A protein has these predicted regions:
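Conserved acidic donor-binding segment of nucleotide-sugar-dependent glycosyltransferases
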Residues: 355, 359-367, 376-382
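Nucleotide-activated donor-binding/catalytic signature segment of Leloir-type glycosyltransferases, i.e.
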Residues: 280-312
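Conserved donor-binding/catalytic core segment of Leloir-type glycosyltransferases
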Residues: 191, 223, 228-247, 253-256, ...
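Acidic anion/phosphate-binding donor-loop and adjacent secondary structure
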Residues: 65-68, 170-174, 202-203, 213, ...
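Aromatic "clamp/platform" in nucleotide-sugar-dependent glycosyltransferases that forms part
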Residues: 323
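Donor nucleotide-sugar binding/catalytic pocket of nucleotide-sugar-dependent glycosyltransferases
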Residues: 38, 56-57, 160-163, 181-225
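Short hydrophobic beta-strand element within catalytic cores of glycosyltransferases
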Residues: 317, 336, 340-343
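A charged, aromatic-enriched C-terminal amphipathic alpha-helix characteristic of glycosyltransferases
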Residues: 305, 365, 382-415
Length: 428
């Protein structure tokens, strides 16, 4: 394969999309030339890319100069904008899901962003002198996928990954993801992070796409050398997420307040976000008066630093309380270190928290439900607890090991490129 055009939201800038860190080095070796187009225009570069790669930033927000150019872009792409609008409305009507006025506005904004990104990609390729044998790879089934669906280059293919926030419409704030199905059907392949995501899209489209594939992400377990793990008599609980409403860390705080145990507890949360101050205050009110209970908000940790923490410290339980997920990389990381997991049964979570590795909670669980599970894991005897730890590590090794998963992904990608670059077919 000659050229990879990888379209991301963050990578290699900022702290987002840390899960690309494990994939990128594996796939980068298979291409002569790599172009990364990131939609992060403000953060510093935090990840390494191969020295031969070209990295471009694309600003998805409209500046004054961009706003002034907008009428020209709309006129130049009017037929494309009209086609996409008609296709989306037609599809939604067939699905008996007529778009509202609000959704039409969201659709138009998304179409214009897709057209603008498409034009930007074409300019980048012209600058780089590339016009054929390209793998267009959007890391999300969002704007990047919409943009590449509109491109047509000789001996080239278009692929996208699909996770959670980019496919589960009902769980978004607007309840609507414009061009979702249009773009999914115009890729040579869509790689879903979970079986649940693939099944969801197939039900929505009412078509079993021949290029709809399940391709689990994976995590690497770095070799930190000989280390002595910290010893403590405390039962240590870890959670790891952005501090935003859908992660529902408040429910975990209430569960910790409710849990009854004679054993000292320590809860550590890794991650930051808009609710941090509010959640720290709530934790102080509810947990500071609880005997034998300590907690710390650790803030943002770089991915490698978090894994180093797991390697060097005793962690007894990992908890995820999200209302919606794809298939969380944070759980893969915990399992790679043999940490039992409690998580909500949403999205593809049940594909990783399988029997013998932890416990699933209903999405609408009560704090008391989680408290009982915490008490259960605290009360496990050493033999049963070690069995769960062993199961967790084996599950990671068999299903979520980055080395094997991304090697398999490359094999599939080579096959699709060989077939797709000759007939330029999409999924429809």
């Amino acid at each position: 394969m000659k050229t990879l055009v990888l379209i991301t939201s963050q990578f290699p800038f900022g702290s987002g999309e840390s899960f690309i860190d494990s994939e990128y080095p594996v796939i980068a070796r298979s291409f002569e030339q790599i172009i990364v187009i990131s939609q992060n225009v403000s953060s510093e570069k935090t990840r390494k890319v191969v020295t031969s790669a070209s990295v471009y930033r694309y600003n998805t927000t409209t500046s004054l100069s961009g706003f002034l150019r907008l009428p020209i872009q709309v006129l130049a792409n009017f037929s494309t904008i009209q086609m996409l609008t008609n296709e989306e409305i037609s599809f939604r009507r067939k699905a008996e899901n007529h778009p509202s006025i609000k959704n039409l506005y969201i659709l138009l904004k998304k179409i214009i962003k897709a057209v603008q990104l498409k034009d930007f990609i074409k300019k980048v390729l012209a600058k780089e002198g590339i016009n054929e044998s390209i793998v267009f790879y959007s890391y999300w089934l969002k704007t990047g996928a919409h943009a590449i669906s509109l491109l047509d280059y000789k001996n080239s293919i278009k692929i996208a990954r699909a996770h959670g926030s980019d496919i589960y419409e009902e769980k978004t704030e607007a309840g609507y993801l414009p061009l979702l199905c249009y773009s999914a059907l115009r890729m040579n392949a869509v790689f879903f992070a979970s079986r649940d995501g693939k099944d969801y899209i197939e039900r929505k489209i009412k078509v079993k796409g021949r290029g709809f594939l399940v391709s689990y992400l994976g995590v690497t377990k770095p070799d930190f050398g000989e280390t002595k793990r910290s010893e403590t008599d405390k039962f240590v609980i870890v959670s790891c997420s952005n501090l935003i409403p859908l992660k529902r860390i408040d429910l975990l705080i209430k569960a910790l307040e409710t849990a009854k145990t004679e054993k000292p507890l320590e809860w550590l949360h890794f991650g930051d976000g808009i609710l941090r101050n509010e959640l720290e205050e709530e934790a102080s009110l509810r947990l500071n008066t609880k005997n034998k209970m300590n907690f710390r908000f650790m803030g943002h940790y770089a991915n490698n630093e978090l894994l180093k923490f797991y390697n060097r410290n005793k962690v007894d339980l990992f908890i995820n309380t999200s209302s919606t997920e794809g298939l969380p990389v944070s759980i893969m990381e915990a399992q790679s270190y043999g940490i039992p997991v409690i998580a909500t049964d949403t999205g593809g979570v049940r594909e990783i928290v399988v029997e013998g590795t932890g416990s699933l909670l209903p999405v609408n669980f009560l704090p008391a439900d989680l408290a009982k599970l915490i008490e259960y894991y605290i009360g496990l005897n050493e033999e049963n607890y070690k069995a769960i730890k062993g199961n967790a590590i084996r599950n990671w090794e068999s299903n979520f090991n980055a080395a094997s998963n991304y090697r398999d992904f490359l094999i599939k990608l080579n096959s699709i490129f060989t077939a797709g670059s000759t007939d330029s077919s999409s999924l429809i």
